[in-house]
Structures are given as C-alpha cells and as structure tokens.
Amino acid sequence: MEWLAGGVTAPAGFVAAGACADIKGNGAGKKDVALLASRVPCAAAGVYTTNLVKAAPVVLTRGRTETGELQAVVANSGNANACTGEQGMRDAAEMARLAAEALGIRPELMGVASTGVIGVPLPMDRVSAGIRAAAAALSPEGGADAAEAIMTTDTFPKQAAARLEIGGATVTIGAMAKGSGMIHPNMATMLGFVTTDAAVDAAALREALREATDRSFNMITVDGDTSTNDMVLVLANGLAGNPRIMPGSAHYRAFADALAAVLIHLAKEIARDGEGATKLIEVRVKGAATLSDARKAARAVCGSNLVKAAVFGEDANWGRVLAALGYSGAQFDPGRVDLWLGDLQMMRAGEPVAFDEAAAARVLREKEVVFTADLHAGECEATAWGCDLTYDYVKINGSYRT
C-alpha cells in the first residue's frame, strides 16, 4: 500500500466541492455545505451512531444504504438537524432531492449527513443555495474544500488517500472525516466519508467497513459523548477494473486492511484534534485474554479523565492507568501486569518499578504520549487513541452555540 496526497477525489470517477451557505447566520464566510459524487452508481455501506436519539439524516441515510447502492452524499455543518421532529425528516429528504436534482440522479441514490447544533431547524433557504453553489463547483480537485465544509470545532480538515494493487489493477481509497468533540465508542463516532474505485460486492463492503471501523473510529475517545448524528459511509464505484471483491475472496483481506489503515489514520487525526487538546494519547494493550478485553482495556485508559488530565499536566501518575484497566471490564490478574510510559517501565508483575521522574517528564512533554500495558492473560492486543483534557475543552463547549 502506498500513501497519496488528497482525499475523497483521489479515486477515479469522484468529484467534490464545498460551499458557503452561512447556515449559522453569522456571516463568518465558512464553507458549510459539502457535496461528493461519483459519475456512476456505487456499492455503498454505512455505520451509524449507537445513540438512541438519532438525527434525521442518520435515519434517512441508514435506510438508503440498506439497498447497498448510493451515488452521492450531501452534508452540512453548523446545524445537526437533530431533535427537529417530522420537519427535520422532511428537510433531510429535501436536501437529498435538491442535490439529486442538481446532479441529475435519482434522490434515492443520495446520502445525507449533518453536524452542528442540536434542536434548531435547518434554514432550508440557505441550505438550498449552498447545495446549488456546491453542485456548480464540483471538480476532481474539490476534495479539500469538501473536507473543510464538514468541519465544526475541528482546527484542521482531515483527509487521507492510499492505493494498492488488486488482481493486476491499481485500486485507490480516499477519505475525509470531521470530529473533535462528542467522540466516543461505539460507532459511529464522527462523520466520515470514504470513496474507492475498487469493484467490491456490497456485502463485502459492509463487512470491510465494520471491521475497519472497529479497528479505528471505535477505538478513539475524546470526551465520552456519542453524538446523535455520527456516521461513516463508503462508496465503491468499480472504475479501477479489478476482479470483483467478494466476502472471503482472495483479494478481500488486502482491501480490508488498506481500508482499515486509511480509517486508522483519520481516527488518530480526530483524536489529535480533540477540542482543546495539546497531546495525542495512544494506549497499547497486549496479552489480553480476548480481543474484546484488549479493546475494552485500551479504550478505558484513553477515556479516563484522570489519565487525560495527568497527561495534560505532564504528571507520570501511572496509578490512574492501572485503575482504568481495573474498571474496564477486561479480565486479568493485577499481580501480573507490566506497564510502560513510552520506553520507561512503571510496573513489573504488578509491582511498582523505580523510574527517572525527569525522563518521564520528557516523555510527557512530547506531542504523542504512549502507554503500553501487558496483561499477561492471553495473546490478544488492541490500540486506542485519545487526547489530553485541557482548560480549553471547557471553554470551547461552554460557548458552543455562540
């Protein structure tokens, strides 16, 4: 696999754009409507928020991906279209209709996504104008603008692209994502849009996306909140001309691993961009009895406010890590645990190890802080990502609606 510059328009046959509709009505000039389209219909799959309260676009798009086919996606930032009742459902459907009309495709082939403030009706006159502007600007170079248009409190757009060989054909995968707050397992944890020119059976695409999501977006946590709006969609248009990837086929594993690598890259970017964050936290758990235990343990440490605050304060308080492991639900013997901060061992076989506080402080001053725990309970391992907890997180979320 080879990494490429770009995002959702890196694969053949995809165009995108971002436009300013001033959805929040503040005249800030921010791009807030994104449009992504393939020149042919695509196999499609999605994963969606586990929050019982689901936004209108989530309900609409989830129903449409059950058919296994989409051709385009329209998304807005600045307004979640969540908790907006029947009018919200009508507005989501109208977004799909307007975008489909501009593209000359059937509305049923449109996915819809929204992100922003909950409980406020969409200003459909502005949204409509934004969709028309985005449609007029569609181009193979528009991926960066689309990635910018889906941002809310993000401090930078998040894109990734990679290519690999499958059956003698070059296959490309591109993606964009947004997210910095309300990021917490389980899926989905943010907005993500993935494109590929691979020929993939819809069932194989669903399986690969679920697997990749479990290894990436479901392994990040910023603040313990799961949004009403989160989704990840993948569209595969088949223009690469590779042998069609089926579940369990010879090429499935290579494709699924490449998809996971792209999503892991974006997941880490989201964790790095956590609201107010100054450091990326990576937690590696090995020696777990089951994969589920490894994932539980890693996520618990990343999600611990005490661990996150200690990392922000550059305090090597490793006891907080062990405490989080203990309440994670993973089964292990605390008397066998080994624990490291970077390359510094903090605990061996359940006993504290003397370490150089100055060296620990140097590790904690880095922009990426890694904890490794060996549970010595089995052979399974997992990695999770998060960020430190800072004063700015409270400032950002204390004034979000303004």
UniProtKB/Swiss-Prot annotation:
The record marks 188-189 as: Cleavage. The keyword Cytoplasm applies. Keywords: Acyltransferase, Amino-acid biosynthesis, Arginine biosynthesis, Autocatalytic cleavage, Cytoplasm, Multifunctional enzyme, Transferase. It is an enzyme of class 2 (transferase). Pathway: Amino-acid biosynthesis; L-arginine biosynthesis; L-ornithine and N-acetyl-L-glutamate from L-glutamate and N(2)-acetyl-L-ornithine (cyclic): step 1/1; Amino-acid biosynthesis; L-arginine biosynthesis; N(2)-acetyl-L-ornithine from L-glutamate: step 1/4. The keyword Amino-acid biosynthesis applies. CDD domains: OAT. Disulfide bonds: none annotated. Coiled coil: none annotated. Belongs to the ArgJ family. This is Arginine biosynthesis bifunctional protein ArgJ. It comes from Symbiobacterium thermophilum (strain DSM 24528 / JCM 14929 / IAM 14863 / T). The gene is argJ.
